A protein has these predicted regions:
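Long, low-complexity, Lys/Arg-enriched
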Residues: 1-101, 111-155
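Residue(s) in the substrate-gating loop at a strand-loop-helix junction
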Residues: 104
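Interfaces and regulatory segments of ATP-dependent nucleotide/adenylate/phosphodiester-chemistry enzymes
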Residues: 107
Length: 155
């Protein structure tokens, strides 16, 4: 379902937990700009500690937008076992009691990170009532390539 920012508040009235990833792409900010901050109880912001200097302050923007509701969680995507350990600890600590609605913004997670999150969401599915997954499409994945025929990922 395609939903614009004005419709977000109607579609997603509230969530107990919002999981997102800070990145260098401004797309990581799109959802938070369109939702009422009062509708989310707790926010988990994952970020790649190996590339935090490339984020153009997007991590700080997310932290500032969500305030005390947000927790920033560093992950090293260079080490697959670190990804699994960090996400495993997060789910163990945050799904020990029942959650209501979980909202996952998968827009800027790495493939590995997203697969591990989906694994844990499946493992802990009895610990939450509802899961909504949102994604903000990129306009162009091959921004350094001019020729449409050479834009292999955007095709």
């Amino acid at each position: 379902m395609n939903v614009n920012n004005m419709e977000l508040n109607l579609q997603i009235k509230s969530a107990d937990l919002y999981i997102c990833s800070a990145s260098f792409e401004s797309r990581c900010l799109a959802f938070t700009e369109g939702i009422s901050k009062d509708s989310i109880n707790y926010v988990a912001i994952f970020y790649n500690i190996d590339e935090v200097n490339c984020f153009d302050n997007n991590l700080q923007v997310l932290q500032q937008q969500w305030g005390k509701r947000a927790t920033s969680i560093p992950v090293s995507y260079k080490d697959a076992s670190n990804i699994a350990d960090v996400f495993g600890a997060f789910f163990k600590n945050n799904f020990s009691s029942q959650r209501g609605k979980v909202l996952l913004d998968c827009t800027t997670f790495t493939h590995e990170g997203l697969l591990i999150i989906l694994k844990y969401l499946n493992e802990y599915k009895s610990s939450y009532d509802e899961l909504n997954i949102i994604y903000n499409c990129a306009e162009d994945y091959s921004t350094n390539t001019v020729s449409v025929n050479e834009k292999w990922l955007t095709k």
